[in-house]
Curated annotation (Swiss-Prot):
Keyword NAD applies: no
Biased composition (Basic and acidic residues): 10-56
Stretches assigned to coiled coil: 8-28, 117-144
PANTHER family named in the record: COILED-COIL DOMAIN-CONTAINING PROTEIN 12, PRE-MRNA-SPLICING FACTOR CWF18
Positions of post-translational N6-acetyllysine modification: 53
A GO-annotated cellular component: nucleoplasm
Cited Pfam families: cwf18
Protein's recorded name: Coiled-coil domain-containing protein 12
Source superkingdom: Eukaryota
């Protein structure tokens, strides 16, 4: 029994030491000592209630009849004009006109010989023109040759008719 009472006495002493250390810390930090033993939340509630007594009333759904209440009434809030802000936001949201269309050929990966093709393309244009001219000349020559043979065939046919009619 004596061991348990000694253990309890020792625990009480340690508790007292802790309380003294806590008191010293409170004094150091400037907090008030709890004399009442009431919880801190109770003190805060009492302070809030005192503050609420002097708050202005927001009577939205009913008109007070008491003069004291009419004096403490908060004026109705006026809606804020937001038209200008909305216009600015709409203007900012408008996309800027695209000046140049994006060419998909520029975005796609290119073949390794694309630069050679680009350099040769100019020369090929000149050659295409020459080729077209040469083809046109050949066609004209054939037509002239056919006209001559056609004319001789017509002459031969007319000669045969004249011979046959004789």
């Amino acid at each position: 029994m004596e061991a348990t009472t000694a253990g309890v006495g020792r625990l009480e002493e340690e508790a007292l030491r802790r309380k003294e250390r806590l008191k010293a810390l409170r004094e150091k930090t400037g907090r008030k000592d709890k004399e009442d033993g009431e919880p801190k939340t109770k003190h805060l509630r009492e302070e809030e209630e005192e503050g609420e007594k002097h708050r202005e009333l927001r009577l939205r759904n009913y008109v007070p009849e008491d003069e004291d209440l009419k004096k403490r009434r908060v004026p109705q809030a006026k809606p804020v004009a937001v038209e200008e802000k909305v216009k600015e936001q709409l203007e900012a949201a408008k996309p800027e006109p695209v000046i140049e269309e994006v060419d998909l050929a520029n975005l796609a990966p290119r073949k390794p010989d694309w630069d050679l093709k680009r350099d040769v393309a100019k020369k090929l244009e000149k050659l295409k023109k020459r080729t077209q001219r040469a083809i046109a000349e050949l066609i004209r020559e054939r037509l002239k040759g056919q006209e001559d043979s056609l004319a001789s065939a017509v002459d031969a046919a007319t000669e045969q008719k004249t011979c046959d009619s004789d």
